[in-house]
Curated annotation (Swiss-Prot):
The keyword Transmembrane applies. Residues 84-99 have a biased composition (Polar residues). Residues 1-99 are annotated as: Disordered. It is a multi-pass membrane protein. It comes from Arabidopsis thaliana (Mouse-ear cress). Residues 1-16 have a biased composition (Basic and acidic residues). It holds the Pfam family Aa_trans. The lineage of its organism: Eukaryota, Viridiplantae, Streptophyta, Embryophyta, Tracheophyta. This is Amino acid transporter AVT1D. The chain crosses the membrane at residues 164-184, 189-209, 236-256, 264-286, 308-328, 345-365, 375-395, 424-444, 459-479, 481-501, 521-541. Keywords: Amino-acid transport, Membrane, Transmembrane, Transmembrane helix, Transport. The keyword Transcription does not apply. Belongs to the amino acid/polyamine transporter 2 family. Amino acid/auxin permease (AAAP) (TC 2.A.18.5) subfamily. It is found in: Membrane.
Length: 550
């Protein structure tokens, strides 16, 4: 039975969502109530000093059967980064609880003690079970039937240092890369130091999030950080911002795929009998949406989860193709362009923010590491690599195409060159593999809000997902301006997610433990984020309005 106990102990330190931890704690709370009152009281006393316990008491979160929304955040975001493919799963909750019921009372107490070591400070308080509930005596025969000592146990799905670097780089090197030359065209060459500055401060805010995670073992995700800092309201606000950011990324995927396909096939058009005509970008937007729709219906996203990790290779391939076209295929590099353009700087800042906004999954990467103490080094490597790649692509693209550079540099590359075709198809295929993974966290969070189990049937789920995907198509057709949408996302959402809220949460959770230098630096980043966000959002909305009226 020792192996069974170790398995349950491993499960405790593995990827558990908030509701799973509380259900596991509930399975052993009877024994705590009967024989471990002193230990439980001690845990409560130690709990009372943590930010999370204060948050619990302030918000009266005492019903473990109704934990705060979203419960599925960690699981769904792990799929997005490829850290925890859905095919690699642990024993279902019901099986774990049945197995726990077969243990002797002493073994249950041991499991509860180990659970309290890391989960005694969850975001949700644990209810005291009814005194009438008792643990039935153990039947040796049933114990033999339920024993899993002869079965191979899954290893804890923790990431090595190199895997964590790969996951972090995959999150950062995404849609922002393809529009970096356009961003430098808007701001001029002095935009490059600003890009470097953004890389430094966003890396620093990632380290601040790590310190928030270290403050209590119950904090495991970005919404958890928000709840620890500002209660349930903070959890809801941050969750909504993160899901809106993911939704906007799905819209950008459709725009990106349709723009590149229409560049390959510009003469495609369709006229409907009712007098409606569709041009090439509109046709390919609809077509690519139909192609990704079946992937959103899937329940098992294992293959897509593994393929999405190839996003790092795709980003490197795009940079190599761009350089090859300029150096080998005769386009050449020309040292021209403006030095600085203040009027367009807010748009550039928004795009830079869009390129560095990976903070939604940083807590997941930290929690999944075998050695979390090396997380700051992971961030430094990821941000350094992405910054170097961003600068290289921005310089190559701007010197190759000058003021004619478009919102996506793949649209400028001559289509008759083989590297150009490789780059364009890479820009088409990569979003196809990431679309379902990006929209799945939104789907899972919204499905949590469905009131009855009868409404959560497979057919209703497919209909719901189809409607959500269709809505991203409608938005993409309404605002088919890749760079402007990227600037809007970066100015409004990324400034909040990557700059403002990490600092605010850090100041709140570690209040009274920070030096004046740390407080001053956080205030500076907050002010910078607010000013940049307001200016960039206004500029992006103004451009969007002008484009819509043209």
């Amino acid at each position: 039975m020792k192996l069974d106990e170790e398995f349950l102990h491993d499960r405790d330190h593995s990827f558990l969502t908030d509701d799973e931890e509380n259900q596991a704690a509930l399975a052993c709370s009877d024994d705590e109530h009967d024989g471990d009152d002193d230990g439980r009281r001690g845990g409560e006393n130690s709990d009372s000093s943590s930010p999370l316990s204060r948050d619990r008491s302030d918000n009266n979160l005492s019903d473990v059967s109704n934990p705060p929304w979203p419960q599925s955040y960690r699981q769904s975001m792990d799929l997005l980064t490829g850290m925890t493919p859905p095919s690699v799963s642990f024993m279902p909750q019901s099986s774990s609880r049945r197995l726990a019921s077969s243990f002797q009372k002493k073994q249950q107490s041991s499991f509860c003690d180990s659970l309290s070591s890391s989960s005694s400070k969850p975001l949700l308080s644990q209810p005291v079970p009814d005194k009438e509930e008792t643990i039935l005596p153990v039947n040796p025969q049933s114990q033999l039937k339920l024993s899993v000592t002869d079965l191979p146990l899954p290893e804890p799905n923790l990431c090595s240092f190199s895997q964590s670097v790969l996951n972090g780089t995959n999150v950062l090197c995404g849609l922002g890369l393809i529009t970096m030359p356009y961003a430098i065209k808007e701001s001029g060459w002095l935009g490059l130091p600003i890009l470097l500055f953004f890389g430094v401060i966003t890396c620093y805010t990632g380290v601040l999030m790590k310190r928030c995670l270290e403050s209590s073992p119950g904090i495991q995700t970005y919404p958890d950080i928000g709840q620890a800092a500002f209660g349930i309201t903070g959890r809801f606000i941050i969750s909504i911002l993160l899901y809106v950011e993911l939704y906007a990324a799905c819209v950008e995927y459709i725009i990106m795929m349709s723009d590149n396909l229409s560049g390959l096939f510009p003469n495609v058009s369709l006229s409907i009998a009712s007098g409606i005509s569709l041009d090439s970008p509109q046709i390919f937007a609809i077509l690519t949406t139909l192609l990704v729709l079946p992937t959103v219906w899937l329940k098992d996203l294992s293959l897509l989860s593994y393929l999405s990790v190839g996003g790092v290779l795709a980003s490197i391939l795009l940079g190599i193709c761009l350089f090859w076209v300029g150096a080998v295929d005769g386009i050449g590099f020309h040292a021209t362009g403006r030095v600085f353009d203040l009027s367009n700087l807010p748009v550039t800042i928004g795009i830079f923010g869009f390129g560095y906004s990976g903070h939604s999954v940083f807590p997941n990467i930290y929690s999944s590491m075998k050695d979390p103490s090396r997380f700051p080094l992971v961030l430094v490597i990821c941000f350094s690599f992405c910054t170097v790649l961003y600068i290289a692509v921005a310089v190559c693209g701007y010197t190759m195409f000058g003021e004619a550079v478009e919102s996506q540099f793949t649209l400028n590359m001559p289509k008759h060159f083989f590297p150009s075709k490789v780059a364009v198809w890479t820009a088409v295929i990569t979003p196809m593999t990431k679309y379902a993974l990006t929209i799945t966290p939104i789907v899972m969070s919204l499905e949590e809000l469905i009131p009855t189990a009868k409404m959560r049937s497979r057919g209703v789920s497919i209909l719901f997902r189809t409607m959500l995907v269709t809505s991203t198509l409608v938005v993409a057709l309404s605002v088919p301006f890749f760079a402007i949408v990227a600037a809007l996302i970066g100015s409004f959402l990324a400034m909040l997610v990557a700059l403002i809220f990490p600092c605010l949460c850090y100041l709140s959770i570690l209040k009274g433990k920070l030096s004046n230098t740390q407080i001053g630096l956080c205030i500076f980043i907050i002010v910078f984020g607010v000013v940049s966000g307001c200016c960039g959002t206004y500029s992006a909305i103004s451009r969007l309005a002008n484009q819509m009226t043209d």
